[in-house]
Amino acid sequence: SEADIKTAMSQPPTRSKSYWSGAENYVADMVMDQLPKLIGSDIKDDLIVDTTLDMSLEEKAEKALNDVLAKDGKKLNASQASLVSVDATGAIRALVGGRDYAQSQFNRAVTAKRQPGSAFKPFVYTAALEMGLTPNSIRNDAPIKIGNWAPENYEQRYSGPVTLATAVAQSLNTVAAQLVAEVGADQVIKVAHRLGIESDLQANASIALGTSEVSLLELTSAYAAFMNGGFKATPYVVTKVTTAGGKVLYQANVANPPRVMNPDIVANMNAMMAGVIAYGTGKSARIPGWQAAGKSGTTQSFRDALFVGFTSHLTTGVWFGNDDGKSMRKVTGGGLPARAWKDFMIAAHKGLTPAPIFGGGQIIDNGLPVAQSAPNADQPTTIGNIISGTSGGGQATQQPTLQQRPSQQPIQPQIVNQTVANDDPQDLPPANLTDDTNPYSSNTYDTCDIPPADVGDTSPHTATVRPHRSSLLDVILGQ
């Protein structure tokens, strides 16, 4: 009646719950976008699409992000987050494109491209190891200037001579910038593209600090090459498409991925990234009982914060930020993203038997350079090799890790036990300034992976490939 209408119109409107809710709908949209490319656009029959998505992991991923956002998002001005988790083959096991699909269908894990910050540094260090350096190579952490660009560490703190392993763990910007100048920005880009980064990357000096934009999906999948022992892990979500009558229209074939890194280099990179979680900027990501490796990333003015890392079972990337690019309140990659990463990974690994990461978290170095040439891309493998060899999470079978080779015994083990009773940094031992093998830095213990001001805002400067200038310390240490 007229009276009922007036009464209803006088009441405040109520929002009905959206039918299309749940993070799995981000994946459903992704599948719909891919189908025309896989089977053509002339689709008339009902289809059955099999995917790699694990709904249990999907729910855990969505909960991990929303729990952190609900607790600290408003306080720290972080309104959005995304997560991607892949296995050793690149299969997408969980993907969350935002905090609420019903509110926003924009997929921040796939479509959005953001600067990765220091989460890009593993590609820099991989290029350096391929050039012949090792995790024990020494570089001077001190103020430097490359052209008109002067990269700085967080709060302008410097440690002097440090190993590359320490530089990775403490996310030292000056060392990463030096390495780009030595190996060349073009070589770093080649490594990133070889591992799976498909976005255009700018060949300038600041690439050392991750100033070129990438998607979380491609970044996470590129990290999976470290997790699986050096094979490309091209991300995929559709495994099979059939008609209602059973006719197969598409079948994924990921049985023989190319090798993209030398196994020795993978083992050393994994050892250095294990240090990030053991005693570096990613301490908040420690998973009780599991060995893990990864890298934090924070961009200019705290606009983006990321943590990407892996166990022997999964590789997961997490991003926090705002759609409008506004700054968060000092949120670093080792903060909210590392916490959400940890929460998800603990839930995802529940009930699985711990297994070490590839290489066991130990440095392989007999005082001689590790392999300098590009890996042999023709060496075949199978999806079964990858799953049985590097994806733990089942039976605790011993991996044929590189340090078991008699000719390549590591000279120095990294911290492999990351299980701690309390994640408070004060529980870690203090620096021993007289012990050169002590991984704990005296001045940069609490550093964050923050790039200096104006990174990427100055005119691009192409790094010049030039050899490292040996110092007396280099000669003494045999560098």
Regions found by a protein language model. Give the residues of each.
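Soluble, non-transmembrane domains of envelope/secretory-pathway proteins that act on or interact
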Residues: 14, 147, 254, 292-479
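Active-site rim segments in enzyme catalytic domains, especially the processed small/beta chain
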Residues: 107, 111-146, 150, 279, ...
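Non-catalytic, structured segments within soluble enzyme domains
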Residues: 1-59, 63, 96, 179, ...
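A generic secondary-structure signal for well-formed alpha-helical elements
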Residues: 1, 39, 127, 131-135, ...
